[in-house]
Amino acid sequence: MAKENKKKRKRRRILLSLLMILFCGVILSTSTYAWFTANKTVTINDITVNVAAMNGLQISVDAINWKPTITTADIRGAQATYPTAVNQLPSELSSLSPVSSVGDIDTSTGFMQMYAGEIQTGTGGGNILTATRSTETHGENGNFIAFDVFIQTTALTQVYLTSNSRVTASGASSGIENAARIAFVNEGNAATGTAPTTIQQLKSTGTPAPFIWEVNNDVHTAAAVQNANSVYHQTTQQTDADPLEYYGVKADIGAGLDIPLDSQDGTYFEKVTPSASTGVDGIPTTAYQSLMQLQPGITKVRIYMWVEGQDVDCENNASGGSLTFSLQISSNTSADGA
């Protein structure tokens, strides 16, 4: 009898162990991780840049050849007449990886400082974030999109993002479009007639600060809602959500620092307040989004497009998605031509 009871206890222990393993398996399969720990890339399906020529507004990729609209082919081919161009546009066969930025400018180049992050296991066994500066190079590779445009105006002109400006999923949505950002850096202005080589070398001093646009801020997938709660300790919902605060990366983070994912340490992170934040319905046709005021002459603007790693929507289930970036700038305030 004692031997039989011992066997029963052993079977119960085995059953309990199996149940614990199954339970742990469920936890692991439903966990979400910021910055992607699985497939770390996002496919770029299309980049559409369209600038409407209204009230004397014209655009160029080299400050030489002016037209009402520029294409991705124009941007990729800019070095033919703008030899020092650094236009980083990953091809449709390439991909993006999450990066983070607070909008700081490297005044030696005029580039916005971007940081590529990676999740590692800390000395205590938990997940930590490491980050290294990711600087753009000319070509069809890179972690993010960056390119220069030149806008010519005949008078002081306020320009706007139209309702045709948006970031959407290509095909089935993974939710990664909800972590996208677009930024505009005013690199400087020169009088019409200034040598193109001089205009091409304009560099931002950091003032004015870059215009950072957060898109699709009011929708999240179920996994992103969980990520917000479990990693960043924020409560949100899948639709009609309030904008969530986030802390962008502003410095390199070494593995030995053991910086946790939810850190707000001011040495490495800074709260980002986007210049514009719009929901999934986008910019309304009745009221375009104010972008910047252009001085008469030629203004160099550097444009960035990226997946923000510190956004709650940047999590494993969203990796491998496909994005389309569309951009249209106008001097009109609405679709009715006002």
Where are these regions (language model features)?
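C-terminal, structured domain-capping segment
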Residues: A38, Y115-N178, A224-A338
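Short aromatic-acidic-glycine turn motif
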Residues: M54-V61, A169-T197, S334-G337
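N-terminal pilin/flagellin-like segments and related low-complexity appendage regions
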Residues: A63-S134, N143-I145
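Short, polar/proline-rich extracytoplasmic segments that appear immediately after membrane translocation
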Residues: K3-S94, N317-A338
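Low-complexity, serine/threonine/proline-enriched polar segments
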Residues: A80-G103, A183-T267
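Short, flexible loop/turn elements at secondary-structure junctions
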Residues: T48, A53, T153-A155, N186
